[in-house]
Amino acid sequence: MNKLFEEFVYMTMKKYEHETGFNFTSQKIKSLLITADGDRKRDTKVDIMAERTSGDKEKIIIDTKYKKFEGIDDFSNADVYQVSTYCILYNAKHAILIYPQWGNKPPEIQAYYLNNDIKQDRKVEFKTINLKHESLKDSMEQVRQEIQQIFL
């Protein structure tokens, strides 16, 4: 289900990217560790990379997680470490973790700044997408609305 959720979010974002001013790519690979001789170890794969198409070329790391998330107490430290590392590797100042919505309404969660980067505005956001719709079209429209809120 993890991969299916990731693909659904990515394909929906890709479909509506012309409305956002961002270009979305999936499974962008970069090495986490490289020796002085150029030997690569531990490649990383970003679920979705959003890059602004004009201006400052801002990058946003998007990581999808198909697991229960009803509030800030439900996040995993490992997930935040993961997107924080991606932000460092790709020189991004914004990461978004996207989960399916479990309750009847989305949790109200503010953006969090990495403790040592408050002045640099490096932040992590937690978003949910309601997948409990009558049709795939309705679910895609929900993702589209989320995309508009994030990127506009």
Language-model segments: what does each one mean?
Residues 1-152:
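Catalytic core segments in nucleotide and nucleic-acid processing enzymes
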